[in-house]
C-alpha cells in the first residue's frame, strides 16, 4: 500500500472542488487548477475530505497514487495560500527589475536578459538583488525559478550568480601558486 496515498487530503474553507470521472478541478482565492488522474487511480470526495484509491495489485499504480495525492494536496494549498520562491542575485552589478509580466536581469553579459513570465506567475523585486516569484501552481513556479537561475548559475569559487534564497553553494578553494 502507498504510504503517501493512504492519508486523506482535507479541504480548507474557501476552496471549491469539482470531481468528475477522471479529472479534478480546484478553485480558490489565488486561482484555479485542474488535474487529470492516471488510468489506474481515482479519487472520491466526501465531508471536505478527498481520498485517493488505486489498484493495489500493480506497483505502478501504487506509485502513481502517492504522486496523485501529493499533486492534489499541492493544488489545494496553492489556490488557498499560494507558493513563493525567492531568488538572490550575488555579484557586482547584478540587478533585477520587474515591470508587469517581464523581468529584466543584468547579469554581467553585454546585454540585459529579458524574461517573459507565464500568466500564472507574479514577480516582485523588493530590492535590486532580490526576486520574489509567487504562483498558485507549484510546478510552474519551480520551472520559472529554475529557468531564471539557469541564466547565471552560482559558481563555486566566488559564489557569483543567481541562487535560491535557501540554497547553500559549496565553495571551492582557488589553486595555489606553483613552486613558490
Explain the meaning of each model-derived region.
Residues 2-146, 150-180:
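N-terminal intrinsically disordered, cationic/polar leader segments
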Amino acid at each position: 500500500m502507498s504510504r503517501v496515498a493512504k492519508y486523506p487530503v482535507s479541504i480548507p474553507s474557501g476552496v471549491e472542488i469539482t470531481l468528475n470521472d477522471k479529472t479534478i478541478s480546484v478553485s480558490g482565492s489565488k486561482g484555479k487548477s485542474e488535474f487529470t488522474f492516471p488510468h489506474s487511480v481515482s479519487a472520491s470526495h466526501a465531508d471536505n475530505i478527498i481520498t485517493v484509491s488505486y489498484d493495489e495489485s500493480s506497483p505502478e499504480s501504487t506509485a502513481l497514487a502517492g504522486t496523485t495525492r501529493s499533486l492534489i494536496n499541492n493544488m489545494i494549498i496553492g489556490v488557498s495560500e499560494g507558493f513563493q520562491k525567492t531568488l538572490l542575485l550575488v555579484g557586482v552589478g547584478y540587478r533585477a527589475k520587474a515591470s508587469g509580466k517581464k523581468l529584466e536581469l543584468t547579469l554581467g553579459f553585454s546585454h540585459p536578459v529579458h524574461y517573459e513570465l507565464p500568466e500564472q506567475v507574479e514577480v516582485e523585486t523588493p530590492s535590486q538583488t532580490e526576486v520574489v516569484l509567487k504562483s498558485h501552481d507549484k510546478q510552474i513556479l519551480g520551472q520559472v525559478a529554475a529557468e531564471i537561475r539557469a541564466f547565471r548559475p552560482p559558481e563555486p569559487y566566488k559564489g557569483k550568480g543567481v541562487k535560491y534564497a535557501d540554497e547553500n553553494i559549496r565553495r571551492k578553494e582557488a589553486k595555489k601558486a606553483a613552486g613558490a
